[in-house]
Swiss-Prot record:
This is Uncharacterized protein ZK112.6. It comes from Caenorhabditis elegans. Gene3D superfamilies: N-terminal domain of ligase-like. InterPro entries: ANL_N_sf. It comes from the Eukaryota. The lineage of its organism: Eukaryota, Metazoa, Ecdysozoa, Nematoda, Chromadorea.
Length: 149
């Protein structure tokens, strides 16, 4: 059984719903020892994965409802809590997730991936904190180019 299949199923014989499923240590901190972190239980992980999966296959999403099994999506996320949840959600609904980190990816590489792989959806965030610096992500993506292939 693949790791993704093991992560998607909430088998009560293996783990309990309220056991910790995801530990997140974020990227924001300041001089007063304030930083973002959290523990997410398996039940909450399951709810979040279901919500993301549903959003990926909504009738308003650019994916046609007929045969979504082999459709590719670009998961253009840095190392944020939404990344593993989105990967699991894509797998759950039969989508192929292409993962790119916007903090280390060059624009030319992003453009080549979009042109070669032709993803139907780009999943990203508006911005992320890196220490005390706000880094805008969404503004770097030109979604227009995806629909012009």
């Amino acid at each position: 059984m693949s790791l993704l299949k093991k992560c998607i199923g909430l088998d009560p014989n293996i783990r309990k719903p309220l056991d910790i499923g995801l530990i997140w240590e974020g990227n924001y901190w300041d001089d007063k020892d304030v930083h973002d972190c959290c523990d997410v239980d398996w039940e909450t992980c399951e709810i979040l994965v279901r919500k993301i999966a549903k959003a990926l296959v909504l009738p308003t999403s650019p994916i046609d409802n007929g045969g979504i099994e082999n459709k590719k999506i670009l998961i253009f996320l840095p190392k944020v809590m939404q990344l593993p949840l989105t990967i699991l959600a894509a797998y759950r609904v039969g989508l192929i997730g292409i993962v790119m980190d916007p903090l280390v990816s060059k624009n030319k590489v992003l453009e080549k991936i979009i042109m070669c792989e032709k993803p139907r959806i780009v999943v990203t965030v508006d911005a992320v904190w890196q220490a005390q610096e706000l880094i805008e992500i969404k503004s770097k993506v030109e979604v227009r180019s995806i629909y012009e292939y």
